[in-house]
């Protein structure tokens, strides 16, 4: 490992430049994020090896991309930094059985999500630097933005700093992804994990999905055509989210009609009110005290019986049948699809 004392912005830049030419990085996993990380880091000048199960489904893809592929244990042995980019629920076994016995002393262990470390499923060896670097976007976007000379914002955190330059390693890694071209924000494993889980459960996945289904059911039960209900509560959601993404809630309000604005002001609080916020707080509490993670681990170890039941119920919801029929006629959707068909590596992937 490079051993440099970081005292100024200049010396930090010097550290990053020198580290780029000497750091060997093992990327464990080659899904959406793993591939984007590997390609961007290689193009930034790092020496990259990929750690995958021999004969696994992504081995050929990594080799076609020009990478040396080794088994995870061998990749870890030869790396100065090991990036764990596999789904959450396989990381504990991967670390305990494969990585911990093989990572060399003084190396850096990097995660893209803090769940396993924060909740104690993984206790990293004390002789390692342990950091987190998480681009705030899917792998396809991380790669695409890098290729056109831009970048996706990243957050980073330090859990263990044995070398006294773990933070600089995290920043160097984030810079290699292209994050420094956009924005890099320091956080903690606790903050990243708890806010990420809350966002997924209360808003981005659980909250929005339940809101859309309830809206669809309300219209259909009132006698409106399912096709019209689908357009109004699901299809047009993209228009609103794109405006949120570009400039926040105020930008969305600038681009909708005055009628829509007034409806937002008077009816939004009737649907999402103080009681909703109280239930959100209960969701957050379950995340903070580990209740959610405890239940999720038990569910996973039991073979996912409830998970499968919930998933099947969503698949059988009437909005899915209607949506499939309507989307089949939206020929432009095919042209908008990217090659990034691998599910993102995160807490929501099994």
Swiss-Prot record:
<keyword id="KW-0521">NADP</keyword>
<dbReference type="InterPro" id="IPR036291">
    <property type="entry name" value="NAD(P)-bd_dom_sf"/>
</dbReference>
<keyword id="KW-0479">Metal-binding</keyword>
<protein>
    <recommendedName>
        <fullName>Ketol-acid reductoisomerase (NADP(+))</fullName>
        <ecNumber>1.1.1.86</ecNumber>
    </recommendedName>
</protein>
<feature type="domain" description="KARI N-terminal Rossmann">
    <location>
        <begin position="4"/>
        <end position="187"/>
    </location>
</feature>
<keyword id="KW-0100">Branched-chain amino acid biosynthesis</keyword>
<feature type="domain" description="KARI C-terminal knotted">
    <location>
        <begin position="188"/>
        <end position="333"/>
    </location>
</feature>
<feature type="binding site">
    <location>
        <begin position="30"/>
        <end position="33"/>
    </location>
    <ligand>
        <name>NADP(+)</name>
    </ligand>
</feature>
<dbReference type="GO" id="GO:0000287">
    <property type="term" value="F:magnesium ion binding"/>
</dbReference>
<comment type="similarity">
    <text>Belongs to the ketol-acid reductoisomerase family.</text>
</comment>
<feature type="binding site">
    <location>
        <position position="232"/>
    </location>
    <ligand>
        <name>Mg(2+) 2</name>
    </ligand>
</feature>
<feature type="binding site">
    <location>
        <position position="196"/>
    </location>
    <ligand>
        <name>Mg(2+) 1</name>
    </ligand>
</feature>
<dbReference type="InterPro" id="IPR013023">
    <property type="entry name" value="KARI"/>
</dbReference>
<dbReference type="GO" id="GO:0004455">
    <property type="term" value="F:ketol-acid reductoisomerase activity"/>
</dbReference>
<feature type="binding site">
    <location>
        <position position="257"/>
    </location>
    <ligand>
        <name>substrate</name>
    </ligand>
</feature>
<dbReference type="InterPro" id="IPR013116">
    <property type="entry name" value="KARI_N"/>
</dbReference>
<dbReference type="InterPro" id="IPR000506">
    <property type="entry name" value="KARI_C"/>
</dbReference>
<comment type="function">
    <text>Involved in the biosynthesis of branched-chain amino acids (BCAA). Catalyzes an alkyl-migration followed by a ketol-acid reduction of (S)-2-acetolactate (S2AL) to yield (R)-2,3-dihydroxy-isovalerate. In the isomerase reaction, S2AL is rearranged via a Mg-dependent methyl migration to produce 3-hydroxy-3-methyl-2-ketobutyrate (HMKB). In the reductase reaction, this 2-ketoacid undergoes a metal-dependent reduction by NADPH to yield (R)-2,3-dihydroxy-isovalerate.</text>
</comment>
<keyword id="KW-0028">Amino-acid biosynthesis</keyword>
<comment type="pathway">
    <text>Amino-acid biosynthesis; L-isoleucine biosynthesis; L-isoleucine from 2-oxobutanoate: step 2/4.</text>
</comment>
<keyword id="KW-0460">Magnesium</keyword>
<feature type="binding site">
    <location>
        <position position="53"/>
    </location>
    <ligand>
        <name>NADP(+)</name>
    </ligand>
</feature>
<feature type="binding site">
    <location>
        <position position="58"/>
    </location>
    <ligand>
        <name>NADP(+)</name>
    </ligand>
</feature>
<feature type="binding site">
    <location>
        <position position="200"/>
    </location>
    <ligand>
        <name>Mg(2+) 1</name>
    </ligand>
</feature>
<dbReference type="GO" id="GO:0050661">
    <property type="term" value="F:NADP binding"/>
</dbReference>
<dbReference type="GO" id="GO:0009097">
    <property type="term" value="P:isoleucine biosynthetic process"/>
</dbReference>
<comment type="pathway">
    <text>Amino-acid biosynthesis; L-valine biosynthesis; L-valine from pyruvate: step 2/4.</text>
</comment>
<feature type="binding site">
    <location>
        <position position="139"/>
    </location>
    <ligand>
        <name>NADP(+)</name>
    </ligand>
</feature>
<feature type="binding site">
    <location>
        <begin position="88"/>
        <end position="91"/>
    </location>
    <ligand>
        <name>NADP(+)</name>
    </ligand>
</feature>
<dbReference type="Pfam" id="PF01450">
    <property type="entry name" value="KARI_C"/>
</dbReference>
<feature type="active site">
    <location>
        <position position="113"/>
    </location>
</feature>
<dbReference type="Pfam" id="PF07991">
    <property type="entry name" value="KARI_N"/>
</dbReference>
<dbReference type="InterPro" id="IPR008927">
    <property type="entry name" value="6-PGluconate_DH-like_C_sf"/>
</dbReference>
<feature type="binding site">
    <location>
        <position position="236"/>
    </location>
    <ligand>
        <name>Mg(2+) 2</name>
    </ligand>
</feature>
<dbReference type="InterPro" id="IPR014359">
    <property type="entry name" value="KARI_prok"/>
</dbReference>
<dbReference type="GO" id="GO:0009099">
    <property type="term" value="P:L-valine biosynthetic process"/>
</dbReference>
<feature type="binding site">
    <location>
        <position position="196"/>
    </location>
    <ligand>
        <name>Mg(2+) 2</name>
    </ligand>
</feature>
<keyword id="KW-0560">Oxidoreductase</keyword>
<dbReference type="GO" id="GO:0005829">
    <property type="term" value="C:cytosol"/>
</dbReference>
